Structures are given as structure tokens and as C-alpha cells.
Curated annotation (Swiss-Prot):
Stretches the record annotates as Disordered: 123-237, 354-412
DNA-binding region of this protein: 261-286
Database matches in InterPro entries: Homeodomain-like_sf, HRS1-like, Myb_dom, Myb_dom_plants, SANT/Myb
Tissue expression pattern: Specifically expressed in vascular tissues of cotyledons, rosette leaves and cauline leaves. Not detected in the vegetative shoot apical meristem.
Spans through the membrane: none
Localisation per UniProt entry: Nucleus
Protein name: Myb family transcription factor EFM
PANTHER family assigned: MYB FAMILY TRANSCRIPTION FACTOR, MYB FAMILY TRANSCRIPTION FACTOR EFM
Family annotation (NCBIfam families): myb_SHAQKYF (TIGR01557)
Length: 432
């Protein structure tokens, strides 16, 4: 760029007419040409400096280009008219040359717009007007030529001013493109019908090929499925004889938990039997043997091997050895009905045969109360009760109306009192 003294922000842009007026008076003198040349050289230098930044400074480049073009035109006009004395005559060519300069970009733009419209027409129709050159046709791609003619005809109608509200008009035949090779001259209607027939034939051929391919694929799939089914091995059916051999092999090998499928297959000696089949059958057999088999208890069968009494397991030999001997526990249960209504079954043994247990709590409290009263009352009360108990059998024996059940009840009551007195003595010793 130039120095700061030469460049400033006070520069006001002037129109082209003002520039012409400023230099119109000095065209006859020679220093004017030198001045114009100096300005042109300086502008060109500035343009070269900004050329590297023309994308960032597009307006500056445009201003410099316009100024350079204006000064060039002025310099050429001054040199051409330097011999003329009339200033007005000398300035007229400058104005005539200057006016087209402003309209020149518009012409180029119009050319570009015309080229774009023609390109759109080419891309949307298969025909071209007569005034289009072959060179412009060669610049078009092939994809644009193969587009449908109906769309192009519709677009052409819209450009000519016809809208959608006009009546429908029949399609008109249009001339062919220059690029197409003309082998035969056929009317457009025949070409259209032939094209339709060709398309129909190609579609029919494609459908036939598609059907043939589908049939071939279905046949190949059917053959492959049948071959795969034939190659697939049938599932092994375990007959009773085969299962019997399997069980025998397990017994020889020491059980299902020890035997291996390979050993079982070798012992069974069956043709076509594989290790996988033996393995699957062995797994099913193990699952079947793990299930607990239900054992229904019959009424006439033998008794259980173990007897439960009060949470204690008693071996069966004790029940067989002491099963038939009557005990005091049986009489107490039978006469007083403290625990059950009847005697226990014969295969159960009574608890007092093996260990001594305290009687139920209600009789115990009752006898404690009696002993407490006896001890507080003195020895006379106990002797009186004892004499009453001992004398009662004679009285009962004398009375003919009393039965044997009452005598048994009194004897059981006497034995029970003796047992409770012994138990109370043992409890006293335990307390001390």
C-alpha cells in the first residue's frame, strides 16, 4: 500500500461524469497525458498489492478495476482527439465510449441468463431449436438429453405465458436433437408407440426372467431342504431291550453316578449308538432315579423301623421286647383319660419302661395340694385317708351291687398316690 500521507479517509468517490469533466479542460496540454499515465500506473500498483486479498476485499478490487478502466478510456480518447481544436467534439467520443462501458456487465449477465434458460430447455426436452449451435449441444451431458419430453413441453408452455387454466392441447411433434444419429426417419407417433412396445417387451422379459429365477431358487431350496433332512440323523428310540442293556451296563460299572457314556456304549455293543445318545439317556436316567418314589403305607403291613416318642427315636427291638407287658401308665391313661381316650397301639412302647417322666401337670398340682394339706393337718389326716382307702375294698367287696371296675379304680388310685408321694420326695431332694 502507499504511505499514510498519500492515503486518507477524506477521499470522496466521484462518478464517471465528474471525472470526465475534471479532465476535460486539460486534454490539449501534454502534461495531461503524463498525469493520466501516472494515475494509471499508481492504480495498477495498488491493484497488484490487493490482488492477494481479493477475496477478503472484493469491493476495493472492484473500485480499482473501474478506475483503471475509466482512465484508460480517457487516455485513449485524449490521444485519438489530440489533433482536434474543438473541445466539445473531442469529448463526444469519450461519452460515446463511456456509456457502453457501463452496460457491458449487463450484456454479459444477459448472455449468462440466456445460456441458463437454454440449458434448462435442453435438460427437460429431447428436442432443440434450430438456432442452437452444435458446439453448445456437445457441451451438454448425456443424462440431460435422456429426460422425458412431456416435462419439457409443459415447462415451455409455462414460459410462453400459458397457465394451468388454458384448455388442454394435443402434443405437437418437435424436431429431433442434432446429436442423435439419424438412421431412419420415423414419425414421432410411431416412435412413441414403438418405445412403448419396446418397454412392454422389456418388462415382460424381465418378469419372465424374475419368475424363472424364483422357480430356480425355490427348486434349489427344496432340494437343499430334502438333502438336509435326509442327511439329518433320525432320533434314537430307546426300546425296552435297549434300556435293559443300558441298566445291565450300569450295574456292571457300579452305578449311574460312576459310569461314563463311553464305557456304557462299549458294554452295550449296539451298532450306531453314539456317546451323545448314551450321555443324554444317562442324564435322563439320573434325573429319574433322583425323584423320591412314593411309598404307600398299607394297614396290614409291618410297623415302622423307628418309633418316635416325645421327640426321641426308639429302636424297634425295645418295642418287641416290652410290647406286651402292661404298665401303670396304661392303667392311668385308660381309667383317668388324661391324655387319650384309648391305650396306645401295641407297637409303641410306654415311656415309663425306659425313663421316668413326671405325670401331667393337673394331677401333679392336685396331689401337691393334697400333700400340702396333709402335712399341715398332721399325721392324723394322713392315717385317716389311708384307713379309708384300705377299708374301702372290704366295704366294696361286701356290697353285691359294686363291680370289678370300681375295685380296679381304687387300686389304681392307691398306686397313684404312692407314686406321687415318691415323686414329691424326689422333688424335695432335688430342691435341696
Amino acid at each position: 500500500m502507499a504511505s499514510s500521507s498519500e492515503l486518507s479517509l477524506d477521499c470522496k468517490p466521484q462518478s464517471y461524469s465528474m471525472l470526465l469533466k475534471s479532465f476535460g479542460d486539460n486534454f490539449q496540454s501534454d502534461p495531461t497525458t503524463h498525469k493520466l499515465e501516472d494515475l494509471l500506473s499508481r492504480l495498477e500498483q495498488e491493484r497488484l498489492k490487493i490482488d492477494a486479498f481479493k477475496r477478503e476485499l472484493p469491493l476495493c478490487m472492484q473500485l480499482l478495476n473501474n478506475a483503471v478502466e475509466v482512465y484508460k478510456q480517457q487516455l485513449e480518447a485524449y490521444r485519438a482527439n489530440s489533433n482536434n481544436n474543438n473541445q466539445s467534439v473531442g469529448t463526444r467520443p469519450v461519452l460515446e465510449e463511456f456509456i457502453p462501458l457501463r452496460n457491458q456487465p449487463e450484456k454479459t449477465n444477459n448472455k449468462g441468463s440466456n445460456w441458463m434458460t437454454t440449458a434448462q430447455l435442453w435438460s427437460q426436452s429431447e428436442t432443440k431449436p434450430k438456432n442452437i449451435d452444435s458446439t453448445t449441444d456437445q457441451s451438454l451431458p448425456k443424462d440431460e438429453i435422456n429426460s422425458s419430453p412431456k416435462l419439457g413441453h409443459f415447462d415451455a408452455k409455462q414460459r410462453n405465458g400459458s397457465g394451468a387454466f388454458l384448455p388442454f392441447s394435443k402434443e405437437q411433434s418437435l424436431p429431433e436433437l442434432a446429436l442423435s444419429t439419424e438412421v431412419k426417419r420415423v414419425s414421432p407417433t410411431n416412435e412413441h408407440t414403438n418405445g412403448q412396445d419396446g418397454n412392454d417387451e422389456s418388462m415382460i422379459n424381465n418378469d419372465n426372467n424374475y419368475n424363472n429365477n424364483n422357480n430356480n431358487n425355490s427348486n434349489s431350496n427344496g432340494v437343499s431342504s430334502t438333502t438336509s433332512q435326509s442327511n439329518r440323523k433320525a432320533r434314537r428310540c430307546w426300546s425296552p431291550d435297549l434300556h435293559r442293556r443300558f441298566v445291565q451296563a450300569l450295574q456292571m460299572l457300579g452305578g449311574s453316578q460312576v459310569a461314563t457314556p463311553k464305557q456304557i456304549r462299549e458294554l452295550m455293543k449296539v451298532d450306531g449308538l453314539t456317546n451323545d445318545e448314551v450321555k443324554s439317556h444317562l442324564q435322563k436316567y439320573r434325573l429319574h432315579t433322583r425323584r423320591p418314589s412314593p411309598s404307600p403305607q398299607t394297614s396290614g403291613g409291618p410297623g415302622p423301623h423307628l418309633v418316635v416318642l416325645g421327640g426321641i427315636w426308639v429302636p424297634p427291638e425295645y418295642t418287641s421286647a416290652h410290647g406286651g407287658t402292661p404298665t401303670l401308665y396304661h392303667h392311668q391313661v385308660h381309667h383317668h383319660h388324661t391324655n387319650t381316650a384309648g391305650p396306645p397301639p401295641p407297637h409303641f412302647c410306654s415311656s415309663q419302661e425306659f425313663y421316668t417322666t413326671p405325670p401331667p401337670p393337673q394331677p401333679l398340682h392336685h396331689h401337691h395340694f393334697q400333700t400340702f394339706n396333709g402335712s399341715s393337718g398332721g399325721t392324723a389326716s394322713t392315717d385317716s385317708t389311708h384307713h379309708q382307702v384300705t377299708d374301702s375294698p372290704t366295704v366294696e367287696g361286701k356290697s353285691p351291687e359294686s363291680g370289678g371296675g370300681e375295685r380296679k379304680g381304687l387300686a389304681a388310685l392307691r398306686e397313684e398316690c404312692e407314686d406321687h408321694s415318691n415323686i414329691n420326695g424326689s422333688e424335695i431332694t432335688l430342691k435341696f
